[in-house]
Amino acid sequence: MSEARYALGVDLGTTNCALSYVDLAAGEGDAGRQQTLWVAQLTGPGAVEERSLLPSFLYLPHPDEMAPGDLVLPWGAQPDFVVGELARERGAQTPIRLVSSAKSWLCHAGVDRRAAILPQEAPEEVAHCSPLDASMRYLEHLRDAWNHGHPDAPLGDQELTITIPASFDPAARELTAEAARAAGYERVTVLEEPQAALYSWIQSSEGAWREQVQVGDIILVVD
């Protein structure tokens, strides 16, 4: 496996997903600072824009709903589903075809999180997917967007951290890691969000944190 050029962080959010990264080969200064990936996504039929966030919505269109070419992405893929901004917009018009809050379903111990139960209120003739599959599709889209913009540094070769809520049970934690592996994320660390927030504060303080906390202090993280 190649040596990682970048350290990547993914926020697989309930409402939005985001990917940030640091160039490990860069020195001090702007080149070595954290950056945000602008994610190419469909914003209308056949229309692609780059946004700083990927809305965590999956839309399962009727086979006759879209014209040929409407779902083509910059990297050549033409899936039979939509994620991101267009999914959110179409889903507002036809909610029975919209998968949302997959992250919340992923930590719902009362359902089979591998079963095709979403959209929950959709009739049988509408396509369904599992909370696990929905999470995987968001991660796949981020992977493809990254690889499209960084062909010499494929995501599978990079060091990657995915944040999860502290409330996730062990099963939800493992399902998140499973979705990441299925999406081609080879080197994955799953980190709880409060811990990630603390690390971010330490990094942004540029050493000043040592003057603000002492050994034995309890730090409150508010999300």
Residue ranges and their predicted role:
Residues M1, V39-G46, Y199, G207, ...:
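Aromatic/His-enriched, Gly/Pro-containing loop or helix-boundary segments
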Residues S2-D30, E206-D223:
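Gly/Thr-rich phosphate-binding beta-strand-loop-beta motif of the actin/hexokinase/Hsp70
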Residues T14, L24-A26, D64-E65, S167-D169, ...:
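Conserved nucleotide-binding/hydrolysis micro-motifs of P-loop NTPases
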Residues T15, S52-S56, E186, G216-D217:
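Short glycine-/polar-rich loops that comprise or flank the Walker A/P-loop
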Residues S20-V22, A172-T176, S200-S204:
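Short acidic, glycine/serine/threonine-rich loops at helix termini
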Residues G27, P68, N147-A153, S205-Q212:
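Alpha-helix termini
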Residues G32-A183, E192:
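Phosphate-binding loop and its immediate beta->loop->alpha context
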Residues R181, Y185-Q203, R210-D223:
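Small-residue (GG/TT-enriched) beta-loop-alpha framework at ligand/catalytic clefts
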